[in-house]
From Swiss-Prot:
Function: Binds specific group II introns in chloroplasts and facilitates their splicing. Acts on subgroup IIB introns. The substrates of the subgroup IIB also require the CRM domain proteins CAF1 or CAF2, with a simultaneous binding of CFM3 and CAF1 or CAF2. May influence the biogenesis of the mitochondrial small ribosomal subunit.
Protein name stated in the entry: CRM-domain containing factor CFM3, chloroplastic/mitochondrial
High-level lineage: Eukaryota, Viridiplantae, Streptophyta, Embryophyta, Tracheophyta
Biased composition (Polar residues): 270-281, 841-852, 869-886
Main subcellular location of this protein, as a coarse class: plastid
Annotated organism of origin: Oryza sativa subsp. japonica
Keywords attached to this entry: Chloroplast, Coiled coil, Mitochondrion, mRNA processing, mRNA splicing, Plastid, Repeat, Ribonucleoprotein, RNA-binding, Transit peptide
Amino acid sequence: MAAAAMAISPSIHLHLHLHLHHPPRLHRLLHLSTTSPYPWLSAWPTAHRRRVPLRRPASALDLRPEPSPSSDSDDDAAFGTSRSSSRSAMSLILSRLRNSGYSYSPPELPPRPPRGSVEDVFRVDDGVVPNARGGFDDDAESALVDARFPWELPMPPPEAGPRAARSKAWMAELTLPEAELRRLRHAGMRLKSRIKVGGAGVTREIVERIRDRWRNDEVVRIKVTGTPALNMRLFHEILERKTGGLVIWRSGTSVSLYRGVAYDIPEPTKGTSKNTQTLGMKSSIKEPPGHSLLPNEKVNEMQDNNGALVSNAEKDTLVEPVPEIKYEDEIDKLLDELGPRYDDWPRPDPSPVDADLLPATVPGYKPPFRVLPYGVRPSLSRRDTTNLRRLARGLPPHFALGRSRQLQGLAAAMVKLWEKSSIAKIALKRGVQLTTSERMAEDIKKLTGGVMLSRNNDFMVFYRGKDFLSPELAEKLLERERWAKSLQDEEQARLNAASSFSSRTEAPVEPTVAGTLGETLEANSKYGNKLDENYENKMTRTVEAARHADLVRKLEWKLQLAQKKIEKAERVLGKVETALKPTEGIQPPETITDEERFMFRKLGLRMKAFLLLGRRGVFDGTIENMHLHWKYRELVKILVKAKSFGDVKKIALSLEAESGGILVSVDKVSKGYAIVVFRGKDYARPSKLRPRNLLSKRKALARSIEIQRREALSHHIATLNRRVKKLKAELLQMEGVKEEGDVELYAKLDSAYSSDEEDVEDEDDEAYLRSFDNSVAVQNGDDRTSLDGSDANSDDEGDYSDEDDDEDDDNDEEDGFDYENDDEDDVPPTTSDGDLYNHTDFGSSDSENYVSLSGRGDPDVKSKGSALDSRNSYSEQSTELTNTCS
């Protein structure tokens, strides 16, 4: 009993300690931690271990007022729930039945937290942990199993050491004991001399130096610089593969290389058996034993459509099974036939041919003979070029080149390679000085006649071309060409010998003159009509009349073409003006007196801030800038550069109607015409500054260009009509003087003939619909700045859709003028009568033309204004514009 009491006492002591120092829930966790590897999972209620359906997601934050118990909500009817209790109608019925005693009532659920509280917004079911995406899974069991802390994950088995998780490249750690590896690393640290590896990588010289060091030391220190230092993991693998040693330590660009335990008898490592060829010698590849084919059954290598090497062994239907041919063996055999291999190739096998060891010059070398088949396009299409480039991207290089000239040996090897492969890929050696890939590519193209597909700092890819011929076929064609040339030379020699031989026995025969030019001239001199002066004049008039009629027909054809163009311009202009709905001229609700008009004109002309109206005319941006200007001033001065006063009058009336202001005056100033508009006494800024009934900035530019094109075509048509009428009249005059010549008329006709501009071909009929003429920008160079401050010579736009109007609106908001003027901020918005008559100095603008815009007001002031009108305005313009405004 005492022993039992002694055995139980520790557990009793633990329970007493838990009850005294820990709360009940923590007590439960500590109690279950001794029996479960995951105590926090075992501590959860058993109800959560089953598949528990999650609650219906509610809104994150619902601040709507609480509904009354008697009110019915449409939202509740839609979801079948009650907003106050989040329960369905069926659950309410069941709760009432349970309260009446008809069914068993389960324990009540905890009350829902108040709406809008932190618990309501960030509520999560107990035991459910968010997944990796931050959401919750429908499967509660999977959520419980996968939601583990890192320290709760299953531990790896004890026998699995830390070395197994590391990279496989550290072969030294897997093969050497820990104590031996530590000793070798310390020995490498004590070494002072290091072997430097440059940009060329692990070359043959580097391998020889490492092996020389291994004769005395078992560890060699290596320092890596240049391009190989960018990828030390790859350098690690290349160094072990080429030297046969083991990398025991690596830090940054420093490496310690161990020669190995059995250095005296080195075993060939992976990839070194294929790089043991002697320089300048070709290795012979023997056929596999037991394999002998007849000459007719020899496996021929052909090309598929993409240029890859394909064996015909699969196509031959032989009774005996054909052995499988590996691609690596075939490509090694092909490269061995081309020349010596590059031993310092840092990339995986197969190693390419060293082009620097090929002969620099080949006696009697000529570019290969090429003949393009009939009906074949000489150049490659884009699709073919792309396919060939993609094919060459995955192929290993065939040659490694490091020199820029004397490439005849490489060219001969490439031609030999093209017999079996349509692509030749050349790798450029790294670390070689004074090499230019561009010069290499040009020399190779001249020597081989191939097509360069791609060129970069690492590779060059050449295609043999569609006109490439195999050596057998090229030799046959050259032989036939030489044979044909010999036949031609023999025939020419026979003709030369026959012409030099003459027979003396026969009498010489005179050559006949029948059908020759001499016979024709002799017959005309004997039997033809002699050309006198009348005949020459008659022929001259006939020729002139024919030329005149031809010119008339040509002008009529041009007239028809111009009429077609103007019809198209009218259609395009009508299409652009579909969105233009100008406001009809309505009398403004308020007017100003003559005194106010005189004062406003004086102040407006003296304003320094102004708006420049460009070639676009009145559009939505114009009205917007007027309202922006009226934010700081009551007046706005607009400068217009127009050809006639009628155009200025239309613009002024349009500005008054669209902006809702009052037109004050239109004056002729040095910069064109100045239009002064008053915003009104009861001015209220509209909600939308840009009226929707006007054109946008882009469409206004298109409209101005189409109008200018129509005017130019109209002028051109009028000119053509005048010329046609004039030529027809001269043609009738020529018929009147048919019998006798008229020197003055012929001189006039010579001046009316077509010049060089008549021979210029007309442009495409639809070209002007897609682009804007550059001449428009030159002719309107002064009108480059529009009302919104943007450049009128914008990029050509052929599509005048409404989709780009919003982008134009944003650009207009960024652009604009600075309407602030420090000198004018002190000027009061209104001027008294005394100030009106005291300011007699009107400046330079008083000498310009002034137009009165109203016939109403005080007669005294009106008489004073008439004196100014007689001195400063045009009477016709004033009367016309005044009648229109009144």
